[in-house]
Amino acid sequence: GSSDFLAVAVREVKEETGVEKPFPQSGAILSLDVLPVPAHEKHGKSVECHKHYNVTYGLIVNPKEKLRIKPDENSAVQWIPVENLKEMVKEQHMLPIYEKLIARMRKQKQMQTEVMAQIAAPLLTWYPSHARDLPWRRTKEPYRIWLSEVMLQQTRVEAVKGYYQRFLENFPDVQSLAAATQDQVNKCWEGLGYYTRAANLRKAAQVICTEHRGVFPDTYAAVRRLPGVGEYTAGAVCSICYEQPTPAVDGNVLRVIARVTDCFCEIDRPAMKQAVTEGLRAVYAEGNCGMLTQSLMELGATVCLPNGQLLCSACPLAAFCMGRKNQDVLRLPQRTTKKKRRTEQYTVFLMRCEGKYAVQKRQEKGLLHGLWEFPNVPGIHTAEEAIQMAASWGTAPKDLVRTAEKKHIFTHVEWELFGVYLDCGRAAEPFVWKSPEEIAAEISLPTAFRQFALDLP
């Protein structure tokens, strides 16, 4: 009864064969056929001759997936090499149909490859008049391009602009960044999140100064070896700064390519990213590598948007976009099922003594390791329990000023935070005690804790 034939095809493959993760090669219908079915017996009952109206799609399955017999539908399920099909097919009258469908799947694959080969020219024509004026696009200096790409990971462009300018004012080159303390770098990064990026920036700057004599490396392999630099960042730096054919493939680019080729492979699988990277490498034009990288980024950020925002009429690739032709844009890209974000609870202590508040560096490995924080303990405790804990730390709590509930969301975890503001009689160790002005000027607090600092009485 469903009108979504593709969804029915995927469901039937799962039910008939037992495979768990089939995906369409394309959303296009391979064939529409009317097939006569002769009279036969099924489960001991006579079935009169009739017709099957077949809508056929080509699906891809990992051959390592286990097959399962469904007794009421089939007696055997197995993988058959295409070259053995003729010998293995029991119903020889179906062989021409199967051969036709296999040929069409191969044709679909060829069309997807041909579409990839067409994208460069229209993108290079479109980009100069549609590119946003962003500060890091006014340079090809590798230090600045590298910095911008690291900042833009998991962060909106508008949020990055101010941080980018401020960071360069404090650390205008790789030498000044290498010479800075991690606290100085973190303070400049404060509020941008994902502080591991800031730590790796400083480590990479030190590597550049010690191993490359302060000169930013100019090969993909050398850039890739820098701490915290992945395939995407290395590809962006080398294509934009050095005009090397090194694609920078992120979620935006994967979405564009999945749609333009009508590819249903889950984009967060490494094999998909690798295939797109190799496909793009083949179409990079000498002398235009940087512009092609930036045009793909721009298209994914401004036109080929996620979440059902269709701007296909403004897309330079619309004329040959297979996803648009097959009306699959809203289906794409496909992703693996995300795990539900877990929730953690903490009680946060805002302990004040003579106008100064207790802070400490986070010792726990993992999230926010090594960063400044207000003292905290797992779980949501009552104010009375919190006062007892503060007393056990030697801070001599005198008055409960107030409490506050906050929340902070990371990529994979959500923190529920209960803040307890206490007036204390003793600035106990090992806490470091800072005034609100000193906190604002000297130390970097992650956003989860900085939201409490904004409300300090």
Which residue stretches match the model-derived regions?
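C-terminal tail/extension regions appended to the core domain(s) of diverse proteins
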Residues: 86, 90-109
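Intrinsically disordered, low-complexity, charged terminal extensions of DNA damage-control enzymes
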Residues: 107-133, 138, 301-457
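Unchanged
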Residues: 2-93, 383-456
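Catalytic cores of DNA base-excision repair glycosylases
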Residues: 122, 126-311, 320-322
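Acidic-residue sensor for enzyme active/binding pockets
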Residues: 12-16, 73, 149, 298, ...
